[in-house]
């Protein structure tokens, strides 16, 4: 049984982790921490967990928690996790970090988007935790940087095609939409009900911090610098994410070749579903699950490829993928604890 701690258990992602680990047959939730709610019971903070989770939130004492767990999820803000991960690693605790602190190989790219990195020596040790693409590297790691939600939705459909040389690496555009839970649980004017209900708007055009994360991965896969035009939008939904990605195919690329590349990559994967030709993802069909659905259309005349993906931003885009990473780290079947299915409505 894997003993698990969740640091930052009272945010939306942390709460999803609490739910998933509580229902995981090979893991036991041993500790939950919260700076804001220290000393309060999880079931008091989230009444839906009443009678299910009886843990009390505690301060994040690394040495005390390390004695009780095998794995820790750091569901902490960006710039905070890097202060805790090194000591957990030193204490032989495997770390899955859900912030951006260990998603980058290039410290300069991280620092340009966030701040100075205080644990640069760990960046080469950390593995980017996009499970279906990097599971072999994840399996041998002690530190996983769980990908961002937008990068997950963009990279899963795009990387297999870049690897096969089927798309041009210049002029890639992603038009992405996210539910409001992506903004986190802390109250803010931008996520206030009256500000988002019955509305739809773009935000952070030209300066979203997920762009350098996506560009680093694509550049490494393409073995050349790649820039992505990324336009995020805020949907008046609680959860869910849909990305529409535009790219030009290389000379000679056909629809059949696109499908073959996607199926070769994902046909044996539980959580990535390549839809039949002519069908496209719907947020409703992945909400509450760890699935990523992918559809595509190629205009043979213009060579314009349109990829569409849908995920639940809190699950495949965060907590679900984090648990999938834990499963890989400990040699479990990837779907363990993630047997989640959408409702009919």
UniProtKB/Swiss-Prot annotation:
It is found in: Cytoplasm. The active site is at 149. One of its GO terms (biological process) is L-arginine biosynthetic process. Keywords: Amino-acid biosynthesis, Arginine biosynthesis, Cytoplasm, NADP, Oxidoreductase. GO terms for cellular component: cytoplasm. It is an enzyme of class 1 (oxidoreductase). It catalyses: N-acetyl-L-glutamate 5-semialdehyde + phosphate + NADP(+) = N-acetyl-L-glutamyl 5-phosphate + NADPH + H(+). InterPro entries: AGPR_AS (IPR023013), AGPR_type-1 (IPR000706), NAD(P)-bd_dom_sf (IPR036291), NAGSA_dehydrogenase (IPR050085), Semialdehyde_DH_NAD-bd (IPR000534). It comes from the Bacteria. Its EC number is 1.2.1.38. Pathway: Amino-acid biosynthesis; L-arginine biosynthesis; N(2)-acetyl-L-ornithine from L-glutamate: step 3/4. The keyword Cell membrane does not apply. One of its GO terms (molecular function) is N-acetyl-gamma-glutamyl-phosphate reductase activity. Disulfide bonds: none annotated. Gene3D superfamilies: Dihydrodipicolinate Reductase, domain 2, NAD(P)-binding Rossmann-like Domain. Its main location: cytoplasm. The keyword Oxidoreductase applies. PANTHER family: N-ACETYL-GAMMA-GLUTAMYL-PHOSPHATE REDUCTASE, CHLOROPLASTIC-RELATED (PTHR32338:SF10), N-ACETYL-GAMMA-GLUTAMYL-PHOSPHATE REDUCTASE, CHLOROPLASTIC-RELATED-RELATED (PTHR32338). Belongs to the NAGSA dehydrogenase family. Type 1 subfamily. Catalyzes the NADPH-dependent reduction of N-acetyl-5-glutamyl phosphate to yield N-acetyl-L-glutamate 5-semialdehyde. This is N-acetyl-gamma-glutamyl-phosphate reductase. It comes from Desulforapulum autotrophicum (strain ATCC 43914 / DSM 3382 / VKM B-1955 / HRM2) (Desulfobacterium autotrophicum).
């Amino acid at each position: 049984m894997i003993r698990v701690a969740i640091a930052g258990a009272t945010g939306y992602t942390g709460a999803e982790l609490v739910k998933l680990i509580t229902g995981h047959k090979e893991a036991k939730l041993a500790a939950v921490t919260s700076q804001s709610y220290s000393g309060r019971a999880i079931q008091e903070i989230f009444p839906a967990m009443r009678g299910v989770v009886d843990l009390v939130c505690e301060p994040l004492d690394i040495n005390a928690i390390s004695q009780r767990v095998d794995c820790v999820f750091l569901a902490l803000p960006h710039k905070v996790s890097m202060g805790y991960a090194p000591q957990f690693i030193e204490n032989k605790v495997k770390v899955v970090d859900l912030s951006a602190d260990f998603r980058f190989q290039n410290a300069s790219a991280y620092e340009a988007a966030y701040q100075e990195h205080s644990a640069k020596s760990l960046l080469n040790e950390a593995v980017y935790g996009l499970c279906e693409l990097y599971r072999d590297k994840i399996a041998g790691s002690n530190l996983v940087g769980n990908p961002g939600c937008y990068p997950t939705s963009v990279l899963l459909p795009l990387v297999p095609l870049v690897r096969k040389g089927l798309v041009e690496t210049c002029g890639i555009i992603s038009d992405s939409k996210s539910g409001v839970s992506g903004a986190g649980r802390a109250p803010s004017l931008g996520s206030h009900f009256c500000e988002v209900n019955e509305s739809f708007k773009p935000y952070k055009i030209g300066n979203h911090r997920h762009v350098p994360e996506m560009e680093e991965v694509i550049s490494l896969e393409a073995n050349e610098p790649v820039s992505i035009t990324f336009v995020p939008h805020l949907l008046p939904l609680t959860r869910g994410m849909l990305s529409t990605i535009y790219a030009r195919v290389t000379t000679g690329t056909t629809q059949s070749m696109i499908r073959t590349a996607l199926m070769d990559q994902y046909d044996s994967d539980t959580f990535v579903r390549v839809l039949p030709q002519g069908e496209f993802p719907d947020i409703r069909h992945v909400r509450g699950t760890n699935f990523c659905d992918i559809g595509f259309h190629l205009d043979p005349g213009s060579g314009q490829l349109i990829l569409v993906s849908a995920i639940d931003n809190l699950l495949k885009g965060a907590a679900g993928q984090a648990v999938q990473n834990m499963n890989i780290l400990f040699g479990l079947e990837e779907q363990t604890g993630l047997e989640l299915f959408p409702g009919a409505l």
